[in-house]
Amino acid sequence: TPPERPREGSNVFEFMNSSSSSERPTQHIAKKVAEDIISTKKKGGKIVLVGGPAIVHTGAADSVSELIRLGFIDGVLAGNALAVHDIEYATLGTSLGMNVHDASLAYHGHRNHMDTINAVFRAGSISNMVKMKKLNKGIMYECVKNNVPFVLAGSIRDDGPLPDVITDVALAQKEYKKVLKDASMVIMVSTMLHSIATGNMLPANVKVIVVDISQPTVTKLMDRGTWQALGIVSDVGAFLPMVASQIRKKK
């Protein structure tokens, strides 16, 4: 049975009662999310991350990598972009030619994106790249090294796409469902397309946390049936490191 919405205190004239707002104490929410993640894992629960490329652009890739390495993420669902930008950052230090550590533009950095795609093609796959020691850190690296399943679903705008990307949408959906089976918590970060798609595959008793800097994205997800989601309007580059820091303190 789906969790009931609380009925007490529901008043037309209540303040701060929207389901998603940027006007919330971010540090406190990050602490609560960290506690939820730890509690879910202690109970033997399964946590799946649905991620977009902004994780890398905003400098949060290291935090996600750490969560995978520590065993807090049991599956990663994404598109071509997250994998490409993550591998570009891991191998060249840039994301779409921007130096992630200081936001400056790298010399000839516009080539890095396609160079990364070509490097994966030369290796044959992401896992081969790890085996060949051409990829030594990052989100995709941690997935391969820690046997965390990942599914990359293709879309019409993809560059490449990488060999690991499933371009048949129906097949990608099936693979998403396999990873989502028995999930206790799903964390959706900075991807409207994959978040809404995943939300449509989940039963109402799965805890969903959606983090995006765009409030309409969070609202759209809830409006399309994933009403049990906790919506957090925040910059993932600040929020995910806060969550990782809290987990480090508590674990």
For the regions a protein language model found, what residue spans apply to each?
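Active-site histidine-anchored catalytic micro-motif
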Residues: 47, 65-68, 72-118, 188
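Gly-rich Lys/Arg/Thr-decorated short loops/hinges at beta-loop-alpha junctions or inter-strand turns
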Residues: 6-22, 43, 117-123, 157-159
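Gly/Ser/Thr-rich loops at beta-strand to alpha-helix junctions
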Residues: 52-58, 81-84, 158, 191-195
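Structured alpha-helical segments in the cores of large, soluble enzyme domains
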Residues: 25-40, 217-222, 239-240
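Short, compositionally biased "basic patch" segments
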Residues: 1-18, 25-32, 140-145
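C-terminal functional extensions of proteins
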Residues: 99-251
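Glycine-rich phosphate/diphosphate-binding loops that line cofactor/substrate pockets in enzymes
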Residues: 31-47, 67, 142-145, 179-183
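Short acidic, glycine/serine/threonine-rich loops at helix termini
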Residues: 2-4, 59-63, 86-92, 162-165, ...
